[in-house]
Amino acid sequence: MSGLSRPLLLAVGCLAALCVITAAGNTTLAPNVTTASSPPPTTTTVPVSPTTLSPLPVTTPAPDICGSRNSCVSCVDGNATCFWIECKGKSYCSDNSTAGDCKVVNTTGFCSVPTTTPTPTNSTAKTTTLPSTTTTSTTATTSGTTNTTLSPTIQPTRKSTFDAASFIGGIVLVLGVQAVIFFLYKFCKSKERNYHTL
């Protein structure tokens, strides 16, 4: 082999190895996200008196479904329009949130010791931001869609596979560059041989 072909052969081998390593390391997995189609949630700002610890949202009257509930958890957990009212030792579930000096509860976090086990329902989604004692307004976010459980789908782990197209493309690229270098070298050497000094 001539002096120039050995480095070129070494360069081809190195570039081929580099192509194989690059193709083997180029595996990316795209996350599979499942989203539920629902209307955007509505945000309502409701004034809160500074003496109460729970928000007093404005509600629309509902049929008498709140009166049949007998515990704080079952009252506020299953329905967005029901409120648990604790007033002077008497507690009851109502759809009217305006009670005089009574404590109005609309989240299970403010319920005192529950008397019965909550019955899970799937009627409406309800998210409420709890106010601090220094704020005078709170933001309640509710949407009219049903609760859905989204479980992410897990893609099986993909083993690194050899990408033949990338490998062949890399070889063609390297051989093309080497051919250009080879012909430039031959061209320069032929010009050098033609002009010998005497």
From Swiss-Prot:
Transmembrane region positions? 164-184
- Spans of biased composition, class Low complexity? 33-54
Per the record, which residues fall in region Disordered?
32-54, 117-152
| Record-annotated disulphide pairs | none
Main localization of the protein described in the UniProt heading: membrane
Where does the signal peptide begin and end?
1-24
Q: How does it sit in the membrane?
A: Single-pass type I membrane protein
Q: Which residues are glycosylated?
A: 26, 32, 79, 96, 106, 122, 147
Q: Which GO terms describe its cellular component?
A: endosome; endosome membrane; lysosomal membrane; lysosome; plasma membrane
Q: Which residues lie on this side of the membrane: Cytoplasmic?
A: 185-198
Q: Which UniProt keywords apply?
A: Cell adhesion, Cell membrane, Endosome, Glycoprotein, Lysosome, Membrane, Myogenesis, Signal, Transmembrane, Transmembrane helix
Q: Which GO terms describe its biological process?
A: heterophilic cell-cell adhesion via plasma membrane cell adhesion molecules; muscle organ development
Region (Required for endosomal and lysosomal localization): which ranges?
192-198
Pfam families in alphabetical order: MGC-24
Hey, which stretches end up on the Extracellular side? 25-163
The record's InterPro entries line, in alphabetical order, gives: CD164_MGC24 (IPR007947)
Top-level lineage group: Eukaryota
Subunit relationships: Interacts with CXCR4.
Question: What does this protein do, in the record's words?
Answer: Sialomucin that may play a key role in hematopoiesis. May be involved in cell adhesion. Promotes myogenesis by enhancing CXCR4-dependent cell motility. Positively regulates myoblast migration and promotes myoblast fusion into myotubes.
Q: Write down the PANTHER family for this protein, in alphabetical order.
A: MUCIN/PORIMIN (PTHR11337), SIALOMUCIN CORE PROTEIN 24 (PTHR11337:SF12)
What family does the Swiss-Prot or TrEMBL record give for this protein? Belongs to the CD164 family.
Name the UniProt record assigns to this protein? Sialomucin core protein 24
The protein's gene is named CD164
